[in-house]
Amino acid sequence: ILCPLEAFIVQHILTISVMGLLSCFRSTVLRKCSKGSSGMSRFLYTNNFQRNLISSGGNESYYGYFNRRSYTSLYMGTGTVGGITSARIRVPNVGCEGFMCSSHLSITQRNSRLIHSTSKIVPNSEIQNITTEMVKTPEVSRWMDQVIPTIAPCDAAEPWQLGFQDAATPIMQGIIDLHHDIFFFVIQIGVFVSWVLLRALWHFRSKMNPIPQRIVHGTTIEILWTIFPSVILMFIAIPSFALLYSMDDIVVDPAITIKAIGHQWYWTYEYSDYNNSDEQSLAFDSYMIPEDDLELGQLRLLEVDNRVVVPAKTHLRVIITSADVLHSWAVPSLGVKCDAVPGRLNQISTFIQREGVYYGQCSEICGTNHAFMPIVIEAVSTKDYGSWVSSQVN
């Protein structure tokens, strides 16, 4: 039987725990709209990382991105979503306001500067030049936050990020699901331990219990606190082992094999399937783009001069090694992290489920410029991948 104070404390602890659990599951929710004639998927996102804001009229779909300098790169493809033009905007920080887009006018402001871009961040879209007015409408962003409680895919690390990057492979989705499952048990254990601690502090303080009762031994309670933790650990261990073994599964006949070689301080990639006896090969070095050379829309310390282009929805094998010291090839959205050891070949298998650009970094301290070894994976359609390979080989 709980006293009123205990009931009050337990009630609030349970409320906070449930809210925390719901917030974790909320991070995996996506609301997807229909496709337009341009073939680009429309999403609705409403947190401060990305927003899809709606404007009326017209028959174009505008895709805009903010980089960390609060500038905008514009992407335009034909087609509408239910007769409504959509604008996809990436907001760099919590204090940034929402924007509404309309065509045929052009203005330049410090926080909404419009720049034409031909980046391949949005695959399969027809990039065209167009002038568009960006009008500040903070009411729109607040309204969207209240109406649609979803968040955007996060394929690169963000400032003050608390959760995982969104999964692009079955392995990463399994990691996120396992985290949520374990977090449920952690909440229950935390609530129980907090209740026991607060109850002991309240009922056994010196005023209420001046002569303490000393308990030397209790068989029942010792059995209970041995059995229950063991059962909880079993519930945690079984799915953990299943996920661990699935991460070690190697595809016997992968569609594409890529070799990643770590150097101080850059990566070299070789597409082994396209090497032949005529000394024709597909290989390149991938260096980080210096901050002074970044174009608008590119991410600081994450962009490279040559991306690793792979087809989406295809079984891939990546062979990883090093030419000098220890490195580690890691891409969080793909759920992969593999050490690059000199004189040894490690391999991982992955299956990217959606098109996009995924950022990673070397995750093993390898010297002075360890922080300047980014990894960029661009997953495109099979058709675009074939065109890219043809252009590289020829």
Swiss-Prot record:
Name of this chain's protein: Cytochrome c oxidase subunit 2, mitochondrial
Role description: Component of the cytochrome c oxidase, the last enzyme in the mitochondrial electron transport chain which drives oxidative phosphorylation. The respiratory chain contains 3 multisubunit complexes succinate dehydrogenase (complex II, CII), ubiquinol-cytochrome c oxidoreductase (cytochrome b-c1 complex, complex III, CIII) and cytochrome c oxidase (complex IV, CIV), that cooperate to transfer electrons derived from NADH and succinate to molecular oxygen, creating an electrochemical gradient over the inner membrane that drives transmembrane transport and the ATP synthase.
Keywords: Copper, Electron transport, Magnesium, Membrane, Metal-binding, Mitochondrion, Mitochondrion inner membrane, Respiratory chain, Transit peptide, Translocase, Transmembrane, Transmembrane helix, Transport
GO cellular component annotations of the record: mitochondrial inner membrane
InterPro entries, A to Z: CcO_II (IPR045187), CcO_II-like_C (IPR002429), CcO_II_C (IPR034210), Copper_CuA (IPR001505), Cupredoxin (IPR008972), Cyt_c_oxidase_su2 (IPR014222), Cyt_c_oxidase_su2_TM_dom (IPR011759), Cyt_c_oxidase_su2_TM_sf (IPR036257)
Gene Ontology MF terms: copper ion binding; cytochrome-c oxidase activity
Principal location listed in the UniProt entry: mitochondrion
SUPFAM superfamilies named in the record: Cupredoxins, Cytochrome c oxidase subunit II-like, transmembrane region
Positions that bind Cu cation A2: C362, E364, C366, H370
Gene this chain is encoded by: COX2
UniProt superkingdom: Eukaryota
Assembly and interaction partners: Component of the cytochrome c oxidase (complex IV, CIV), a multisubunit enzyme composed of a catalytic core of 3 subunits and several supernumerary subunits. The complex exists as a monomer or a dimer and forms supercomplexes (SCs) in the inner mitochondrial membrane with ubiquinol-cytochrome c oxidoreductase (cytochrome b-c1 complex, complex III, CIII).
Source organism (scientific name): Glycine max (Soybean)
Stretches that traverse the bilayer: 182-198, 227-243
Species lineage: Eukaryota, Viridiplantae, Streptophyta, Embryophyta, Tracheophyta
Binding residues annotated for Mg(2+), in chain numbering: E364
Membrane topology: Multi-pass membrane protein
Positions annotated to bind Cu cation A1: H327, C362, C366, M373
Cofactor binding note of this UniProt entry: Binds a dinuclear copper A center per subunit.
Transit peptide (residue range): 1-119
Alphabetical list of PROSITE patterns matching this protein: COX2 (PS00078), COX2_CUA (PS50857), COX2_TM (PS50999)
Regions of this protein lying in the Mitochondrial matrix compartment: 199-226
Protein family (similarity comment): Belongs to the cytochrome c oxidase subunit 2 family.
Side Mitochondrial intermembrane, residues: 120-181, 244-394
Catalysed transformations (reactions): 4 Fe(II)-[cytochrome c] + O2 + 8 H(+)(in) = 4 Fe(III)-[cytochrome c] + 2 H2O + 4 H(+)(out)
